[in-house]
């Protein structure tokens, strides 16, 4: 058997199961980086009004790539069946995973709030200085950095996951430090941004009906206000589902002290869910933009 010898999971993966999960991480990483990269280039080449209309959406895609940034280390370690990059590498992967994940969730919150401003406070949004976007984006990354740094400073800690092929918050040590970290993070960096973001989107969606058709036509771009608002809502719903696996493992471990007894399968499902959710974002954008692109004339002479 392979995995973390310090863990006593109910089921430990065989060599072939590690090969299979390593291949999944490798494919997911390639798919997310390829699709998000193409989507970022596509959006960056547009000339919308206001000019920074797609700025936060682009950073949503950048943070989706960051969530998958550890896939090469995760995939190679899974294929071998053990962590390959030592204790320093473990701390770096834990930090990067939390930085990417928390920044991604907060960037979704910023995208939802931008949709609310774009629909419900149109005049201010149209004249909003570019520096506001820089401040908002920087603040979202600051929140991600804060939560990723705390385990390095002693509020909880990073360690090997139950399958022993990647590192994240050490849920096998459910002490008071871990419990307080998990509960504060769940409330202030998951429940709050997701619920607040959904409320903002619901207000924006209601406000769309008040925009005159002439204004909608004038503001029409590769992605309309309706499409962007629908994207923001879909992104939050996808994230609520795709990050629920990590939420379950973290809360379960905090309440039951059973993190060390998780099976290898239950240890792999949360990261696969979150990474798969990130792959859906650029697909939805391409689907909507494909419907907005002008159709070529295919009539025969």
Swiss-Prot record:
Subcellular location field: Membrane
Protein's GO biological process: phototransduction; visual perception
Gene3D superfamilies from the UniProt entry: Rhodopsin 7-helix transmembrane proteins
Coiled-coil regions listed: none
An MF annotation (GO) of this entry: G protein-coupled receptor activity
Extracellular face of the membrane: 1-17, 77-94, 154-180, 256-264
TM stretches of this protein: 18-43, 55-76, 95-120, 133-153, 181-208, 231-255, 265-289
Presence of keyword Iron-sulfur: no
Membrane topology listed for this record: Multi-pass membrane protein
Gene Ontology cellular-component terms listed: membrane
One Pfam family from the record: 7tm_1
Cytoplasmic side: 44-54, 121-132, 209-230, 290-301
Function summary: Retinochrome is capable of acting as an effective catalyst in the light to convert various isomers of retinal into 11-cis, the form that is required by opsin to resynthesize rhodopsin.
Similarity comment text for this entry: Belongs to the G-protein coupled receptor 1 family. Opsin subfamily.
Protein name: Retinochrome
Species classification: Eukaryota, Metazoa, Spiralia, Lophotrochozoa, Mollusca
């Amino acid at each position: 058997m392979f995995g973390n010898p310090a863990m006593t999971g109910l089921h430990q993966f065989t060599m072939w199961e590690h090969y299979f999960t390593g291949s999944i991480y490798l494919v997911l990483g390639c798919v997310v980086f390829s699709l998000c990269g193409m989507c970022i280039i596509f959006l960056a080449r547009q000339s919308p009004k206001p000019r920074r209309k797609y700025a936060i959406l682009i950073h949503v895609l950048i943070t989706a790539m960051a969530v998958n940034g550890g896939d090469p280390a995760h995939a190679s370690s899974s294929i071998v069946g053990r962590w390959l990059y030592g204790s320093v590498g473990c701390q770096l992967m834990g930090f990067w995973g939390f930085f990417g994940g928390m920044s991604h969730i907060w960037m979704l919150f910023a995208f939802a709030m931008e949709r609310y401003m774009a629909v419900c406070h149109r005049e201010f949004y149209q004249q909003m200085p570019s520096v506001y976007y820089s401040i908002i984006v920087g603040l979202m990354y600051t929140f991600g950095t804060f939560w990723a740094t705390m385990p390095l400073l002693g509020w909880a800690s990073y360690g090997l996951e139950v399958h022993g092929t990647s590192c994240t918050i050490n849920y096998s040590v459910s002490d008071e430090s871990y419990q307080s970290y998990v509960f504060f993070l769940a409330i202030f960096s998951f429940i709050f941004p997701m619920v607040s973001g959904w409320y903002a989107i619901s207000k924006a969606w209601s406000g769309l009906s008040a925009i005159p058709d002439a204004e909608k036509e004038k503001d029409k771009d590769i992605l309309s206000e309706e499409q962007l608002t629908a994207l923001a809502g879909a992104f939050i719903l996808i994230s609520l589902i795709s990050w629920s696996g990590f939420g379950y493992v973290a809360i379960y471990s905090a309440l039951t002290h059973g993190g060390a007894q998780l099976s290898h399968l239950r240890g792999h499902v949360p990261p696969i869910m979150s990474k798969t959710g990130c792959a859906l974002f650029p697909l939805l954008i391409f689907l909507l933009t494909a419907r907005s692109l002008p159709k070529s004339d295919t009539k025969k002479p």
